[in-house]
Amino acid sequence: MVRLVLPNPGLEERIPSLDELEVIEKEEAGSRPKWDNKAQYMLTCVGFCVGLGNVWRFPYLCQSHGGGAFMIPFLILLVFEGIPLLYLEFAIGQRLRKGSMGVWSSIHPALKGIGIASMFVSFMVGLYYNTIIAWVMWYFFNSFQEPLPWSECPLNQNQTGYVEECAKSSSVDYFWYRETLNISTSISDSGSIQWWILLCLTCAWSVLYVCIIRGIETTGKAVYITSTLPYVVLTIFLIRGLTLKGATNGIVFLFTPNITELSNPNTWLDAGAQVFYSFSLAFGGLISFSSYNSVHNNCEMDSVIVSVINGFTSVYAATVVYSIIGFRATERFDDCVNTNILTLINGFDLPEGNVTSENFEAYQQWCNATNPQAYAQLKFQTCDINSFLSEGVEGTGLAFIVFTEAITKMPVSPLWSVLFFIMLFCLGLSSMFGNMEGVVVPLQDLNITPKKWPKELLTGLICLGTYLIAFIFTLNSGQYWLSLLDSFAGSIPLLIIAFCEMFAVVYVYGVDRFNKDIEFMIGHKPNIFWQVTWRVVSPLIMLVIFLFFFVIEVNKTLMYSIWDPNYEEFPKSQKIPYPNWVYAVVVTVAGVPCLSIPCFAIYKFIRNCCQKSDDHHGLVNTLSTASVNGDLKN
């Protein structure tokens, strides 16, 4: 077992002893916030961990990597990567009773950069995450109509047909790209602010501010709704989905394993990344939340419970999503077959009703044998249920295109639309609670603002500043900017932060000391599983993921998808390379958090060297003066 611990002078003075912990907890009772009850804490952590990615990214990864086969690497890495790091964050926050900034600076002043990096990432992710909530609110407000506004294409100015862009694509595509985003054809073409998105963005930030105005005192109340309602809605959708035609096609397609995918490195890479991101690790929010617990709270049990709920939610949400996707694919398959039947009937002037989906192939063969030349001129569509099921359905495309299309085909579609977007709103809002906690608490720890400022004022200023910067997402190019930040702000930086967190606890704070802390808090030392994963397995997994990601990304040209009605293959999205100036944005978004860790450590080292030099110089001067005055005695 590795027992290396780096020198860490002054640690005993920076952290309270175990004997002092209970005394400090009693002294903080009136000044430091605490959870009203255990359920409130657990719901907040679950709400932060379980977010939009569980609903729209995990199902896509299952479908892309062999269906049920993806569950194998996902569950393995959940156990060896996700749970150990979650336990570590819970335990260190509860032990040191500080936010992410205070925890790492207490372990060693040079590690304060880890807290700064977490704060930067929380800020940037929160910046665009609340814009998604604004889009959800826009769809929610438009759901109180019959028929739904995205169920039909609008007429052109002459009222003689549909708008050309909508006719070429679909009503759901048109409502998303044109009516909602009014998207441009390039990230360089910023355009103007879309007032309806700005209005929804204002509402989203206002609701968030009201919920987090007093930290856990207010978020602790909101999570009773935001963390539980999504499960109610998911269950309602599952019951409804299972009654729809073709739902089982989607579920069977999702969980049918393709074992050969297990030999694909990308499958393991994506599984590791999904486990990592779905736990909301390294944002700093979980450390802050756990610091409000009682000293003797069982953080080990908490980490296991939250992890099980998180993994279960991912699988449960995937089942719900693919029951709906199965229904949508079956509807499209039936429409495709009916179109081909109509083509055959019109081409050979057959009586209506004679040709059905059951005898269609037989009629095709008869028509081809009867009049091969006329049959050859007919254009039939390719109808394959698996091709409809396997269409990429990741991210916003799943929520705002695929699901909205499926909802339009359901009876009482406005009701299902309202329920769906309420669920997304709750998932997004509860995740934002943790993101903002990861910004507000570190800023308080940095003492940038006067201590006499109330938390309500600091929280309000942060929300206002972030809201103003988020105006960029209300432009015509806003979707492209959001995708850019989503790809780089919460990927590599989080991986590096998490690796540094584990290294700091195991090799700077000392894993033996950490074990004694946990024994004091929960009554027993962590078992051999935690020892091995903390010291070796989890850091190694993160290192491998980072190296694979680095090798893959370095060799790739940065591309993004645009919506261009003039594209030859429209309505397919066109892939084009990013302009050169975007690379500077990527370096800033991903580089600033990563570089803040070594840069702050170097700054601390140089500062300490300068202080030692000054102290030595001051001592020499003092001794010289004393000697001259005859004050020194042998």
Swiss-Prot record:
- Could you tell me which SUPFAM superfamilies the record lists for this protein? SNF-like
Glycosylation positions in this chain: 158, 182, 258, 354, 368, 555
On the Extracellular side, which residues?
Answer: 63-67, 141-192, 243-268, 326-413, 478-487, 553-581
Instruction: List, in alphabetical order, the GO biological process terms annotated in this UniProt record.
Output: neutral amino acid transport; response to nutrient
> At which residues is Phosphoserine found?
17, 627
Instruction: Cite the record's tissue specificity text.
Output: Predominantly expressed in kidney and small intestine (at protein level). Expressed in the intestinal brush border (at protein level). Expression not observed in other organs, such as lung, skeletal muscle, brain, liver and pancreas. In kidney, expression is localized in the renal cortex but not in the medulla. Substantial amounts of expression in the proximal tubules. The distal nephron segments and the glomeruli are consistently negative. In the small intestine, expression is exclusively localized in villus enterocytes.
Which GO MF terms are attached to this record?
neutral L-amino acid transmembrane transporter activity; symporter activity
Which keywords appear in this protein's UniProt record, sorted alphabetically? Answer: Amino-acid transport, Cell membrane, Glycoprotein, Membrane, Phosphoprotein, Symport, Transmembrane, Transmembrane helix, Transport
Phenotype of the disrupted gene, per the record: Deficient mice exhibit reduced growth, impaired body weight control, insulin response and amino acid absorption and excretion.
| Function noted in UniProt | Transporter that mediates resorption of neutral amino acids across the apical membrane of renal and intestinal epithelial cells. This uptake is sodium-dependent and chloride-independent. Requires CLTRN in kidney or ACE2 in intestine for cell surface expression and amino acid transporter activity.
What this protein is called in its record is: Sodium-dependent neutral amino acid transporter B(0)AT1
Species whose genome carries this gene = Mus musculus (Mouse)
Identify the coding gene.
Slc6a19
